[in-house]
């Protein structure tokens, strides 16, 4: 579960390394984001010369989440870290590579570009 003020790692090569969630999309009272949900993040650490810089604000989608999520077949999926992929205004990834596995729930949410770039889909 991702909420406001949650620190996350970035799983792409956009230049950002660490981000902090500042808003969860989905209505006024929505508190938590799970796998495949969009959030707004603030860049907290970035590499020099990257696409994004520290203090930038951009959209992101959650690709890995520590809190387990139940699937329709009854199984559960969870990861060791909270990770996001940064998105541009059109909803496509800002980076050209994805690091680490991503959840299968992204395919259901129509993030096909992220799924195709990922080395492994769990």
Curated annotation (Swiss-Prot):
GO terms for biological process: translation. CDD domains: Ribosomal_uL14 (cd00337). One of its GO terms (cellular component) is cytosolic large ribosomal subunit. It comes from the Bacteria. InterPro entries: Ribosomal_uL14 (IPR000218), Ribosomal_uL14_bac-type (IPR005745), Ribosomal_uL14_CS (IPR019972), Ribosomal_uL14_sf (IPR036853). Keywords: Ribonucleoprotein, Ribosomal protein, RNA-binding, rRNA-binding. GO terms for molecular function: large ribosomal subunit rRNA binding; structural constituent of ribosome. PROSITE patterns: RIBOSOMAL_L14. PANTHER family: 50S/60S RIBOSOMAL PROTEIN L14/L23, LARGE RIBOSOMAL SUBUNIT PROTEIN UL14M. NCBIfam families: rplN_bact. Belongs to the universal ribosomal protein uL14 family. Binds to 23S rRNA. Forms part of two intersubunit bridges in the 70S ribosome. Part of the 50S ribosomal subunit. Forms a cluster with proteins L3 and L19. In the 70S ribosome, L14 and L19 interact and together make contacts with the 16S rRNA in bridges B5 and B8. This is Large ribosomal subunit protein uL14. It comes from Chlorobium phaeobacteroides (strain DSM 266 / SMG 266 / 2430). The gene is rplN.
